[in-house]
């Protein structure tokens, strides 16, 4: 049997219109936009274009639904520029390309105004022809894919059915969520998918919503002692290989064999942070590449943190991505983390 190689990523495809503002205004007041730029966004594009800019040589492919409009043209141009296979990206004649207006404040804090557009229509039938030789299938974001978030009598949700199909076709599977505080759908939509997952990479807010654990207190302090408990819950719920929970302070990884690790983030000054759009996807790209290459957990988390760190140096989701040798050189030059 031919060995599998590469990553195919599917789900929310959109264009981020990123605006730099000096501060968030009070209701009824005006604040000037100091700088604007357009960039691709959403889990598949952020992960794939980060991996492409890492220059790893892995075959990369995208699957999604976009509109017949300028934003859709831009997405296809970006995929072509970075030599990502776009043959499975379909265009809708009835729905616009999804887009977000992103307001970024000094220090990197951002607020999203999102129009789902064509992503709402992505459904199981769009995956019928996916029988590629890629090793990993990455889906994102659950809770923002209306058709795939619908109930399924046998699997619980249509996204769970999709992930089961992908595993049955020989892919290792990975899933990303969206951060939605207080969304009552977290457990009913996420739980059915976990048993069909090899990798789950989420942030502490998403992990807290699913597990019910308060990983960050009301004053913003991280409850690091509960990160292990949350990861264990997610692994026990069905994830087969790795659970990684990341946050600005660091990341906790847990493997099915029992290996666990807390890895602090690489230190940055606040003045260095330009934006955090796509930082979680950059982190995820690092985890997926390292997992594809069967790297140990410690090295996996270090690479993921390096990907996220360089992401923070730019306003959009991909411009901060660096070639893999540069990331590895950065890691080697860092003092040992506690």
Q: Where do the protein language model's features map onto the residues?
A:
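Ribokinase/PfkB-type carbohydrate-kinase core domain
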Residues: 1-15, 73-91, 95, 102-262, ...
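Glycine-rich phosphate/adenosyl-contacting loop at the front of the ribokinase-like
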Residues: 1-84, 272-276, 337-338
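Short glycine/serine/threonine-rich phosphate/pyrophosphate-binding segments
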Residues: 43-47, 96-98, 284
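Alpha-helix C-terminal capping segments
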Residues: 49-57, 104-105, 290-293
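Conserved post-catalytic alpha-helical subdomain immediately downstream of the catalytic base
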Residues: 237-242, 266-337
